[in-house]
Amino acid sequence: MTKNEYLIEKLQANLANHITELTSAYGEVTIECEVHNLLPVMIELRDREEFSFDQLIDLCGVDYLHYGDYDWETESATEHGFSRGVERQEAKAYAVNKPRFAVVYHLLSTKKNHRLRVKLFVEESHLIVPSVHHLWKSANWFEREAYDLYGILFDGHPDLRRLLTDYGFIGHPFRKDFPLSGEVEMRYDAKLQKVIYAPVDIVPRIVVPKVIRNDNRYIGNEGSKND
């Protein structure tokens, strides 16, 4: 029996009533649970001898907005952009019938030498998840980062402040609907002789997937494509 097979067996035996999904792919085991079951599941994973997950090595947020789209919706841009070269697809590559946001935890057992990914989806209208900082101290800054970048609140966190963005920053920059150029820029005003904040004056450009067209512009004299 491999380590992953052993882990899956113990998860099914001890946490079947608390998890909604269990998968094993690419050598990694992943479980999903509801928000209200997070703390009971995490306590079992840390304290039960069969698991012994003594380290939280990563925690992050995920935004699944537009996940599975074949291509992006384009808007007017220089020379009409590249939308004319994209064949629109009616269906998505992947269908996700779950809330937009998720929180992902990666656990490591130094005693058992196995790893586990724990995922839970959070309703956009109620982005609140219990903090696990009292179980693993490393969660402190991980949770602050997820709050800063995605706006996910961690109930019970002792110091839930922004971690990476500037003072007074508005919005959460890793959300898929956050503008690439941002909302506010900081610059030096020579007239006022001080640093000021102002709305960005960058004109958004449309970033689109590369489109390869098989027409005469890309065919060499001998009928072969140029490198």
Curated annotation (Swiss-Prot):
Cross-referenced NCBIfam families: NuoC_fam (TIGR01961), PRK06074.1-1 (NF004730)
Pfam families to which the protein is assigned, alphabetical: Complex1_30kDa
Keywords, sorted A to Z: Cell inner membrane, Cell membrane, Membrane, NAD, Quinone, Translocase, Transport, Ubiquinone
Enzyme class name: translocase
Taxonomy of the source species: Bacteria, Pseudomonadati, Pseudomonadota, Gammaproteobacteria, Legionellales
Transmembrane segments: none
Function per UniProt: NDH-1 shuttles electrons from NADH, via FMN and iron-sulfur (Fe-S) centers, to quinones in the respiratory chain. The immediate electron acceptor for the enzyme in this species is believed to be ubiquinone. Couples the redox reaction to proton translocation (for every two electrons transferred, four hydrogen ions are translocated across the cytoplasmic membrane), and thus conserves the redox energy in a proton gradient.
Source species, domain of life: Bacteria
Membrane topology, as annotated: Peripheral membrane protein
Name of protein: NADH-quinone oxidoreductase subunit C
EC number: 7.1.1.-
Chief place where the protein resides: membrane
GO cellular component: plasma membrane
Subunit structure: NDH-1 is composed of 14 different subunits. Subunits NuoB, C, D, E, F, and G constitute the peripheral sector of the complex.
